[in-house]
Amino acid sequence: MTLKGCTVAAALVLLASGAPRAATEANFGPNTTGDLVELCTAIPDNAAVNFCEGFAQGAVLVEMQNQVAFRGPKLFCMPNPPPSRNQALSEFVNWARSSPDRLAQSSTDGLFRFLSERSPCPPSL
């Protein structure tokens, strides 16, 4: 094997050990919080990550609009300024993985539970 071949082989071995898992087609519901976590932790530049970001952003925006329209109790109150999308999704993944029962919840229930714990509303809201 040439030096170039050895270098490529060594790089692949090193990358494989710490590489994010590939999301599968079954995760693209996403039916559970675990499915959403798999999508959010896929290899960067993978369609799964884009799906995760779009799903989360869409769900949050719809819920925020519902909170304004129905004027009931709010599930969460976003801080000002809000966290970056990458920061929030990283925190969500860590939160979900910290307790296996969270992974079995529906994807939106898990996301909103995380947000309600991370960004609770003041008692008056």
Regions found by a protein language model. Give the residues of each.
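Positively charged n-region of N-terminal signal peptides that target proteins for export
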Residues: 1-5
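Bacterial N-terminal signal peptides
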Residues: 7-17
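Sec/Tat signal peptide C-region and signal peptidase I cleavage site
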Residues: 18-24
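N-terminal low-complexity, Pro/Thr/Ser-rich intrinsically disordered segments
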Residues: 24-31
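Short N-proximal segments of mature Sec-exported proteins
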Residues: 31-94
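C-terminal partner/receptor-binding element of secreted or periplasmic proteins
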Residues: 103-125
